[in-house]
Swiss-Prot record:
Reactions listed under catalytic activity: phomoidride A + S-adenosyl-L-methionine = (-)-phomoidride B + methanol + S-adenosyl-L-homocysteine + H(+)
Organism field: Fungal sp. (strain ATCC 74256)
Recorded metabolic or biological pathway in which this protein acts: Secondary metabolite biosynthesis
Protein name stated in the entry: O-methyltransferase phiE
SUPFAM superfamilies documented for this protein: S-adenosyl-L-methionine-dependent methyltransferases
Amino acid sequence: MSAPTVVGQRDPEKAWAYKKDVAWYRTELSEETIGPMRPILELYSKVPPESVVEWIKTVRDKAWEVYPYGTIGMFGFLTLSLPTHPSYPDILASLQSGKKTFLDIGCCVGQELRSLTYAGVPSENLYGVDLHQGFLDIGYELFRDSETLKSTLLAADVFDENSEVLKDVEGKIDVVHAGSFFHLFDWDQQVTAAKRVVRLLRPQPGSILVGKQAGDVNAGQKSRPGKLGSRYRHNAESWKKLWQQVAAETGTQWEVSVRELEDKEYFREMTGGVDLAKVKSYGDWNPETTRRIEFLFRRA
């Protein structure tokens, strides 16, 4: 199936957010940033090696017009989350068997799905959900696979209880991946999203939620810069506490593994390369207290 044509989809109420003179819009793209995405683009997508950098920049600027998230401006969509998780070898092996289904929530341009497809996972067993149809369309363009990818890509709002496309996949997923997703919201919104994830997963022991997100040693609601409001940043204990609430409200039980990791490079990546020597804080990011929260919840 051919991907729809991508057109500018700016939110007129947030025109201020699309300016490019901000720290989270990078003009240069290094080989280090491209990283493991280069062989995927060259060998899976058939982008000529000498064209990879300009191809990424061109498609990135189209994605910026859909919505100017930091992960777009900083080329964060090139960074693969799942392959760096300790559970990845086991999850990959189970997916390669062709008997398990996988859903990436907040999938952006579907980079995790293409990585798994490139690694030998049957693409028809892969699902992606994102709020913005434009990102899904741009993913087809970036990876040049609109005629070959068999994955199911859904434009949906996880907070919309009436979403028919999400209802159609409830109870059908073995592994849900959430990379840099939950940290976008406040506590109550995270609980709501987590309960939706519970419904998406198969209602049986062994179903998995895996991922990572930005956290803070001092858990709490954190103000964001400018007009961006606030969101809840967890430490390991508060993230476990939230899932205790989710378990109680859904009548489910979970084996919980959470790690709180100090990672200065993660801070740089997520803030657009802010110089740690020159800042004490950056919006809701603090170089001394920001942590990477890595988690795996397995249904018992």
